[in-house]
C-alpha cells in the first residue's frame, strides 16, 4: 500500500503520529510519503496545493489527513484551495461519516441510547461547486446567489453506494432531503432512490425531511441505519450525529472515490485546535478510527476490524481519565 500522509496544521501532526503507529502495527510495511501542506506551506511559498503535489497524490492508494486550519490564514483559503480542491480533483463523491456510540462513551442524550448508523453524504455537488455570484456588492441592492447543482449521474452513484452499505448492514436506508420545498432537486433524489431500490428488494426505504431528521437523530437515533443525503444537508447532520455519539473528537470520516480511480482520503473530523497544539494532550482516537475506515476501504478487512475493536475496548475502559496523546496511542496499541 502506498499512503500519502498530510499531517497538516495544529494538532494534526500529533494525532497522525499515533494513527500511523497503529497502522504500522496492523499492516507493517506500508510505503508512506509525507506532504507538508497547510498554513506553513502557504506562508513560506504563497501556494496551497501545487499542481505537482496534486499529481503525486494521485499516484498513491490512499491519503491520511490530520487537520487543516490556522488563525493566521485568510478565511476560506485552505478550505477551498486545499480540502475542496482535493475533493473535486480526486472525485471524492462519497463523504462517509459513521455515527456510533461506543460503550463507555457518554452521549448528551438521556439514557445513552444504542446508536449505530452511517451517513453517506454526496461530496462533489450541491451548493459547494462554486456556482453562484454576487452583484452590486456593498450596496443596499446587493444580490448574492449560491446555486445547488444536482446531476442524475452524481446522485445515482451516491445512492447506489448507500444501498450497497445498507445491504451489508441492517438493510434500512433513509433519504434525507427537503423535497416539499426544494422540489426539483428533491424530486431527482427521490426518483433515484426509488429506481435503485428496485435492485435491492431486501432494503427497506424511508424518507425524512431534513428538519424532521434532526429531531429524530436526537429523540430516536436508533431508527437510522444508512442515511443518504446531499452535500449541504449532509454537512449539517453529520456534525449533529457526531455530537450525539459523544462529540466531534471521536468522529472519523472518509472522502471516497467509489470507483477506485483516485485515492480516497481519510481524516478525523475535528479541527486543528491551535490552542492546544504542541502540548501533547490532543486525543488521537478519531485519527485512529480514520485508519480503520481507510483499511476497510482498501479491503484490509481483518486489520480494520482489529483497529475498531481495539478502539472500542479502549473507550469502554477509559472513563474520565485524562490521557496524553501518546498515552491514548499506547492504550489502543495495547488492545490490538
From Swiss-Prot:
Broad class of the protein's primary localization: cytoplasm
Q: How does it assemble?
A: Homodimer.
The protein's required cofactor(s) are namely:
Mg(2+); Mn(2+)
Q: What would be one Gene Ontology cellular-component term for the protein? A: cytoplasm
Q: Which family does it belong to?
A: Belongs to the isocitrate and isopropylmalate dehydrogenases family. LeuB type 2 subfamily.
Q: GO biological process: what's one of them?
A: L-leucine biosynthetic process
What's in the keyword line of the UniProt record?
Amino-acid biosynthesis, Branched-chain amino acid biosynthesis, Cytoplasm, Leucine biosynthesis, Magnesium, Manganese, Metal-binding, NAD, Oxidoreductase
Q: Provide the species name.
A: Mycolicibacterium gilvum (strain PYR-GCK) (Mycobacterium gilvum (strain PYR-GCK))
Quote the protein name from its UniProt record: 3-isopropylmalate dehydrogenase
Q: Which SMART domains does this UniProt record tie to the protein? A: Iso_dh
Q: What is the lineage of its organism?
A: Bacteria, Bacillati, Actinomycetota, Actinomycetes, Mycobacteriales
InterPro entries named in the record: ICDH/IPMDH (IPR050501), IsoCit/isopropylmalate_DH_CS (IPR019818), IsoPropMal-DH-like_dom (IPR024084), LeuB_actb (IPR023698)
- Which pathway does UniProt place it in? Amino-acid biosynthesis; L-leucine biosynthesis; L-leucine from 3-methyl-2-oxobutanoate: step 3/4
Task: Site Important for catalysis: list residues.
Answer: 128, 178
Q: Which residues of the sequence carry a binding annotation for Mg(2+)?
A: 211, 235, 239
User: Where do transmembrane segments lie in this chain?
Assistant: none
Amino acid at each position: 500500500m502506498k499512503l500519502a500522509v498530510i499531517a497538516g496544521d495544529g494538532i494534526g501532526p500529533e494525532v497522525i503520529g499515533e494513527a500511523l503507529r497503529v497502522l504500522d502495527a496492523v499492516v507493517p510495511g506500508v510505503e508512506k510519503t509525507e506532504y507538508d501542506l497547510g498554513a506553513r506551506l502557504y506562508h513560506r511559498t504563497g501556494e496551497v496545493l501545487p499542481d505537482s503535489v496534486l499529481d503525486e497524490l494521485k499516484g498513491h492508494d490512499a491519503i491520511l489527513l490530520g487537520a487543516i486550519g490556522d488563525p493566521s490564514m485568510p478565511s476560506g483559503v485552505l478550505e477551498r484551495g486545499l480540502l475542496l480542491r482535493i475533493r473535486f480533483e480526486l472525485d471524492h463523491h462519497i463523504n462517509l461519516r459513521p455515527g456510533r456510540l461506543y460503550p463507555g462513551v457518554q452521549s448528551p442524550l438521556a439514557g445513552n441510547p444504542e446508536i449505530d448508523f452511517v451517513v453517506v453524504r454526496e461530496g462533489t455537488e450541491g451548493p459547494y461547486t462554486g456556482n453562484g455570484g454576487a452583484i452590486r456588492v456593498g450596496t443596499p441592492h446587493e444580490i448574492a446567489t449560491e446555486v445547488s447543482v444536482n446531476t442524475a449521474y452524481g446522485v445515482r452513484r451516491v445512492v447506489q453506494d448507500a444501498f450497497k452499505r445498507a445491504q451489508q448492514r441492517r438493510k434500512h436506508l433513509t433519504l434525507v432531503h427537503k423535497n416539499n420545498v426544494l422540489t426539483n432537486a428533491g424530486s431527482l433524489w427521490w426518483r433515484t432512490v426509488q429506481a435503485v431500490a428496485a435492485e435491492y428488494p431486501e432494503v427497506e426505504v424511508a424518507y425524512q425531511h431534513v428538519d424532521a431528521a434532526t429531531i429524530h437523530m436526537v429523540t430516536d437515533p436508533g431508527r437510522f441505519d444508512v442515511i443518504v443525503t446531499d452535500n449541504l444537508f449532509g454537512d449539517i447532520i453529520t456534525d449533529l450525529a457526531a455530537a450525539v455519539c459523544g462529540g466531534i473528537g471521536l468522529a472519523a470520516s472518509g472522502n471516497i472515490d467509489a470507483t477506485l480511480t483516485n485515492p480516497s482520503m481519510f481524516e478525523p473530523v475535528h479541527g486543528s485546535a491551535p490552542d492546544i497544539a504542541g502540548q501533547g494532550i490532543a486525543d488521537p482516537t478519531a485519527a485512529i478510527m480514520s485508519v480503520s475506515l481507510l483499511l476497510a476501504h482498501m479491503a484490509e478487512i481483518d486489520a480494520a476490524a482489529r483497529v475498531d475493536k481495539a478502539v472500542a475496548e479502549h473507550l469502554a475502559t477509559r472513563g474520565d481519565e485524562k490521557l496524553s496523546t501518546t498515552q491514548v496511542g499506547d492504550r489502543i496499541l495495547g488492545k490490538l
